[in-house]
Amino acid sequence: MRFQAGLTYFLKKLYPDTFQIPDMQYRSNMLQERGAYRFAAFTRLFFWTEPGYETGVMPDGMIYYGDAQWYVNKKKAYSFAAKGGHNDEPHNHNDLGSFIIATDAGQCLADIGSGEYTRDYFREKRYTYLCNASAGHSVPLIDGQEQLAGRERAAKVLEHGEHVFEISFEKGYGIEALTALRRRFELAEDSVSMRDSYQFDDGNTHQITERFIALIEPQETAAGVLVGDVLLVCKEKPAVNKIIIKDHNAEDLAVYQIDYAAGTEFEIQFQIRG
């Protein structure tokens, strides 16, 4: 993921004491990297870029954006981001509870991003595109069902702090028997631990698939599944599936779904090995 220089310099003007401009090697080249060319983005680049500013490194630390329910935490070894929110956002993805873990190797637990813009992409078939559907995010499938779209499909943040982020997001699923679904992240300097807890009120056994998305090819080892610099350690046996989709530039993109069959309590640790 590269930054847009024009918008970045504009933010530097607004927040001169706290906002850092990344090194120019990470700058986006709009003409080479973007499949949808926008006049507004070009004008921002042309009028707002002021190369006189010094580049720097964002300090380590946690930021929580309450209105959007976005949690971002930068450590020395990795960066972590997770979201609550709702499933009726602009350019919406059905992604309550999804998260990213990034290292110098890139996004190890990844967000696919936007797909190829077609007519159906913005119509009723929007959520048949993997990048927009919850099946293309690091969130569970319950009885084979994905999250649904809509403003009522919303999460609730239960706790956020320097080392923890916890949400409930059972409303994301149209499953009447699902009365509670909590996802809790605990962050250390070299690992992220995640625990999901489910409650159902019908007394039945439900099929739960915990899914994690990668764009780096996973390697199955004796210790766990290695994705870039991140080792997924879980007592359950993984199943890895590769799917080819069209990315925003209409080019083939390999997406890896790492699935675990789970019960009503599920724990996994993401160990940073870089």
Segments predicted by a language model, with ranges:
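Carbohydrate-active enzyme catalytic cores, enriched for enzymes
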Residues: 1-108
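CBM-like, beta-strand-rich accessory domains located in the C-terminal region of large
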Residues: 1-38, 114-274
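Residue-level structural signal for beta-strand termini and adjacent loop
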Residues: 85, 113-114
